[in-house]
Curated annotation (Swiss-Prot):
Part of a sulfur-relay system required for 2-thiolation of 5-methylaminomethyl-2-thiouridine (mnm(5)s(2)U) at tRNA wobble positions. Could accept sulfur from TusD. InterPro entries: DsrC-like_C, DsrC-like_dom_sf, DsrC-like_N, DsrC/TusE. One of its GO terms (molecular function) is sulfur carrier activity. The keyword Transferase applies. The keyword Transferase applies. This is Sulfurtransferase TusE. Keywords: Cytoplasm, Transferase, tRNA processing. Its EC number is 2.8.1.-. Belongs to the DsrC/TusE family.
Length: 109
């Protein structure tokens, strides 16, 4: 759990929010800092993308799904694992969904 803006937010043992409705754009930099990431506009693009993906499909995208969906929307330049790993070095699907306040992708270890 973590304290943010005077309230306690429940997280699991790995730091994922237990309730995605606790998330806000103001909380994202705090979650990113815990991952050793300073959010830049390219990070925000991916974070907002995975949130939109979750809202549409009711699941957090695993890495293959994330790469494919990013390529469809943004093209090969951003829709490839090398680009995503530069932004999220410990795992784009895991770190982006955590920062976006979403559940851990099912196919992530």
């Amino acid at each position: 759990m973590l304290e943010f803006e005077g309230r306690i937010i429940d997280t699991d043992a790995q730091g994922y929010l237990k309730n995605s409705t606790d998330w806000s754009e103001a909380l994202a930099p705090v979650l990113a800092e815990q991952e050793g990431i300073t959010l830049t506009e390219p990070h925000w693009e991916v974070v907002r993308f995975v949130r939109a993906f979750y809202q549409e499909f009711n699941t957090s995208p695993a890495i293959r799904m994330l790469v494919k969906a990013m390529a469809q929307k943004y093209g090969e330049e951003k829709g490839n694992s090398r680009y995503l790993y530069r932004l999220f070095p410990k795992g784009p699907a895991k770190q982006a969904t955590k920062i976006a306040g979403l559940p851990k992708p099912v196919k992530c270890i």
